[in-house]
Amino acid sequence: MSNNALQTIINARLPGEEGLWQIHLQDGKISAIDAQSGVMPITENSLDAEQGLVIPPFVEPHIHLDTTQTAGQPNWNQSGTLFEGIERWAERKALLTHDDVKQRAWQTLKWQIANGIQHVRTHVDVSDATLTALKAMLEVKQEVAPWIDLQIVAFPQEGILSYPNGEALLEEALRLGADVVGAIPHFEFTREYGVESLHKTFALAQKYDRLIDVHCDEIDDEQSRFVETVAALAHHEGMGARVTASHTTAMHSYNGAYTSRLFRLLKMSGINFVANPLVNIHLQGRFDTYPKRRGITRVKEMLESGINVCFGHDDVFDPWYPLGTANMLQVLHMGLHVCQLMGYGQINDGLNLITHHSARTLNLQDYGIAAGNSANLIILPAENGFDALRRQVPVRYSVRGGKVIASTQPAQTTVYLEQPEAIDYKR
């Protein structure tokens, strides 16, 4: 396929719209979107969407690219717990080199590009006196920029106050260029340390004009309630749109009375949430007998309350999650199941949880299929969101700045009965 800039995308479907559409591109931007009267023939510098669905690129709002591709190195996480994952990572972290981090991150980034992801927020462990992973990922951010916008979270994996020089390392990471301040209050030694760590996180974000993304209450303990501190600080400082609480799996175990009071604060604060269905359903509930908790935050209730929430991977092939190919439709598929969002409308709108909601979480400004926006989009060989999710379709094309950066030829399956018949899994 030619790498020339496209002028038009034809025969496209758009979410919530009837018929076929053509999208005009100029200088890497969407210049106009017009309805078609019927199927149009392909012309030079046009791309045939083949009556597929055109949507903005997938967004990965939460991944750890510094740990990716390390599952089983040197040991596997046998218990499947978050805490053994941290132990296994500590073993692997001792073997880190600059080139090792870059090679593994690039391998997964290529998978993400192939899967239609063009915006990524990665957490990078800064509980390391040398900041090896951070320095490597800052280089990767510049190298991958033509294909992916990469945000880097300075993530204090072993705590801000509970790790030697944790606060100083976190601040140094921001000085070096990390985009987002991270925290992990539930992993600090005490509740008091956890609360204090959040105050320090907000102070650093204000000092360096950074976003905030907290690993928050990623535990089955119903007494882990640091999300209320995150929301209260965000509300007090007027920073809600710039603040994200990731995981909040303990919310799965909160009692109804407390949750009702909490949701009032969450709505007032305007903070964002990221759930990571594949990893949450794998790591949580490990200390339960039966019944076992699903351990995923209250996504359905957040959606009903108008609170911004999205889905991420968290991990791909590392000590916390031994599987994964960086496919966002797999994340969405699991998320809709475990959150019981299985009505037709909920499924059809589900793509928002890995596109528009995630873009809002990352504070992306130039995003969406609209005239004037950058010509960044993907084409799915599907009629609508429901069809895309049910059939788990590949990304037919990923377009960035008006150029195709990835394409996938759809597989064709044939069954040989009385007569050969192609199977497309459509009704």
Curated annotation (Swiss-Prot):
Known Gene3D superfamilies for this protein?
Answer: Metal-dependent hydrolases (3.20.20.140), Urease, subunit C, domain 1 (2.30.40.10)
* UniProt: Zn(2+) binding residues: 62, 64, 215, 314
Q: Which GO terms describe its cellular component?
A: cytosol
Question: Which positions bind substrate?
Answer: 157, 320
Alphabetized InterPro entries for the sequence: Amidohydro_3, Metal-dep_hydrolase_composite, Metal_Hydrolase, Metallo-hydrolase_Enzymes
GO terms under biological process? cytosine catabolic process
Record keywords: Cytosine metabolism, Hydrolase, Iron, Metal-binding, Zinc
Cofactor(s) demanded: Fe(2+); Mn(2+); Zn(2+)
Q: How is the cofactor bound?
A: The purified enzyme contains a mixture of Fe(2+) and Zn(2+) bound in the active site, and a single equivalent of metal is required for full catalytic activity. After removal of the metal, the reconstitution of the enzyme with Fe(2+) gives the highest activity, followed by Mn(2+), and, to a much lesser extent, Co(2+) and Zn(2+).
Activity control, as annotated, is: Fe(2+)-CDase is rapidly inactivated by H(2)O(2), whereas Mn(2+)-CDase, Co(2+)-CDase, and Zn(2+)-CDase are not inactivated by H(2)O(2). CDase is also inhibited by excess divalent cations. Phosphonocytosine, a mimic of the tetrahedral reaction intermediate, inhibits the deamination of cytosine with a Ki of 52 nM.
- Consequence of mutating residue 247 to Q? 200-fold decrease in catalytic efficiency
Its practical application is: Cytosine deaminase is being explored for use as a suicide gene for cancer gene therapy. The cytosine deaminase/5-fluorouracil combined therapy has been used successfully for a variety of animal tumor models and is currently under investigation for the treatment of human cancers.
Binding of Fe(2+): at which residues?
62, 64, 215, 314
**What happens upon changing residue 157 to A/N?**
Less than 0.01% of wild-type enzymatic activity
Task: Please name the GO terms that the record assigns under molecular function.
Answer: cytosine deaminase activity; ferrous iron binding; identical protein binding; isoguanine deaminase activity; zinc ion binding
Positions of the catalytic residues: 218 (proton donor)
PANTHER family assigned to the protein according to its UniProt record, in alphabetical order: CYTOSINE DEAMINASE (PTHR32027:SF0)
- Quaternary form? Homohexamer.
Tell me, what does this protein do in biology?
A: Catalyzes the hydrolytic deamination of cytosine to uracil. Is involved in the pyrimidine salvage pathway, which allows the cell to utilize cytosine for pyrimidine nucleotide synthesis. Is also able to catalyze deamination of isoguanine, a mutagenic oxidation product of adenine in DNA, and of isocytosine. To a lesser extent, also catalyzes the conversion of 5-fluorocytosine (5FC) to 5-fluorouracil (5FU); this activity allows the formation of a cytotoxic chemotherapeutic agent from a non-cytotoxic precursor.
Provide the protein name: Cytosine deaminase
Species per Swiss-Prot/TrEMBL record: Escherichia coli (strain K12)
Q: What is the lineage of its organism?
A: Bacteria, Pseudomonadati, Pseudomonadota, Gammaproteobacteria, Enterobacterales
